[in-house]
């Protein structure tokens, strides 16, 4: 189908900004008038420099970039994106290669999965990573004992590290050298600049509070004509019109649609430890990896470009995946965040003197994780790194998620409004790594054509199936 004559994109996050950039580079949209709307003024000093939005989920120092997905389509997309991260998208320090160690608790990595073991998720991820590395054990290799895990972390082997055999349940995992992390805040600012300097996108600052629904004119009307979304309503009462509205407002998307069950919207706590320059250099020297501990449901990234060691919890969807491989059905979260909650959908720093019990509990988990890593009173040669375990958190941040039940994105036309409203949301805590390729695929889905680009394993039909609008909300009207 031809590109619409006028397009509004609501939201300048991962989905919205990548779409705007891709449209600016796609000749199919050369005649389209494209407007990108966000409430945040990214260019307060003029168009030559962009400042990240501190309330956005992507305002962060680091995001893990890896391609070991069990689903072929995601794996294909992730590998394509990773190649771009290693080129211009990750230039100037925006992407850095760093190996990842994924660990869980259970029996030998070489044994079949056993019920109730968190190591099952790790075994599955290892199998995918090993195959995609061409079965090259120099790139992906097993850590089949607690001692091997500690050696891979570069932190020495604790005196109490288990020396048990393969039939004992202990900490095990694997290391993948084909991974890294990206500085998300800097990347989004860079992409804004590329998009602005294309001179193809109009930037509009404003808070969208609703979608404008229109009916066909009398000359075009017919029985049972479906309504159309013909633009947006801003908080100052003004309206902007377009043939196509792309709603990519992250955690705010369900609220704007009036579809609270479209995504599970909730927040988690992220904490940062400021490393000294000596600690940063020492961790780099020891080839300290990215760490994903599925037993603890915690992952760590660092040292980053600001010298932080970042600690975060699995999203609920990630936790559910781990439990699924252990044979445990955890179902949906028990409590949804009320949409009228103060600060709903807005990320930001937390006042550490006024933390809720839930946040305090999470920080205690992080502290325990750090004490395990940088322990004292054992044979490990840690030197001054032990101080990391007890240092106060330099920053505690609230981060919002928009999970789908399947963890698949929602990138599709809203079925109740024809081809006038397109939804791009449901990042489920894994969308950022696809940033270099996501906008291109969204454009293909808008045009309902792959323009000959997509291969047989990632056809437009497969993406339409994978990212379709969920049936339960398909007839929700604005």
Swiss-Prot record:
Glycosylation sites: 97, 167
Binding site for FAD: 14-15, 38, 53, 57-58, 63-64, 208, 432-433
Highest rank taxon of the organism: Eukaryota
InterPro entries (alphabetical): FAD-dep_OxRdtase, FAD/NAD-bd_sf, MTOX
Coiled coil: none
EC class: oxidoreductase
Cofactor(s) demanded: FAD
Keyword Signal attributed: yes
Signal peptide: 1-22
UniProt keyword terms in alphabetical order: FAD, Flavoprotein, Glycoprotein, Oxidoreductase, Signal
Record family assignment: Belongs to the MSOX/MTOX family.
Quaternary structure and interacting proteins, as annotated: Dimer.
Name listed for the protein in its UniProt record: Amino acid oxidase imqH
Organism: Aspergillus flavus (strain ATCC 200026 / FGSC A1120 / IAM 13836 / NRRL 3357 / JCM 12722 / SRRC 167)
